[in-house]
Amino acid sequence: MFEVFMYPVSGIMKFWHWLIGSFVDESTAWLVSIILLVITVRGIVSPLNWMALRSGRISVLMRPESTRINEQMNHAETTEEMAELIQKQQDLSKSYNYKPAAGCIPPLITIPAFLGLYQVILRMSNIEQGSSTVGMLDAADVAAFRETTYSGVPITDFARDHGDLLNPIVIAAIAFTLANSIISVVRSFLTTQFDQKVNRRIFIIIGILLIVAPILLWYLAHSGPLPVAIILYWGWAYLFTLVQTIVFEILLHKRYPLTEEVHEMRRESIRAWRQKDKKPALSKEEKKRVNRLRLEARKYLRSNNQQEGPTASE
């Protein structure tokens, strides 16, 4: 199933090895190709990560006014009134240049890259059991890779057999992960509405992962079937992610600082959660009425836009 991921990963590694092979020895070239694989993959998804982060911050900045509009929608009585509020919400998004980003895209690239590298290394570790080629790597590439060492240890060996040697890298990877997670938790704390159950639970899950992730990484490195090359990939990948996170946080702080109104909404949500002060919810009948009005209002707006279109072009 994961074989398909081997081809782009092995292709990237082969390209970088070919490019730098003239300047360094064979073993160093393969080690550097792993680092450049990290930079290539993370570099591709960095703009997407920024788009997702920027989109999330803008939605937070819009929250106070957007919340007021949503509350007004719950009390709208006519289609025209609802249409006016929907238009107001659309204008708000335009004023902030809000473009929802596909936050799920980066994992769809980084996870296959990791799985592809894992399959490449694992198959080269057990090459005697199958073909002499792996992905886009031919027999000569595989043989050279298998002879590549890190501090005298073949990078196709399992990391659990060389714990003392790799502990500094594992500890560094865990430190990078912890620092990155702490930054994410602080960012989430400053933007989470704690009186909303879903948002509160997501924040709690992030906090739990802050504790579980380092333990899991340590366990996998010392007990799992992970080659040395994967540990090297981890170390550089988490370092890249931490640097990226710090840069993005600086950009967010300078370009999209949180307003006092946003902070006050968060503080009020914490007070409401602690005091168990729940806002009165709409009844089923009211929800149906509001949803019906929204549907009618959208049709009303589309109809008006279609009528105004030819006139605007003339």
Question: Where are the model-predicted features located?
Answer:
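Interfacial loop/helix-cap signal at membrane boundaries in integral membrane proteins
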Residues: M1-V32, L137-H162
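Cytosolic, positively charged, low-complexity intrinsically disordered regions immediately flanking transmembrane
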Residues: V243-E314
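Hydrophobic alpha-helical transmembrane segments
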Residues: G21-M51, G103, F158-I171
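Membrane-spanning helices that line or support transport/gating and their immediate boundary helices
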Residues: F15, P47, M51-R54, I58, ...
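Membrane-interface amphipathic helices and adjacent TM-edge segments
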Residues: I44-F114, A179-L216
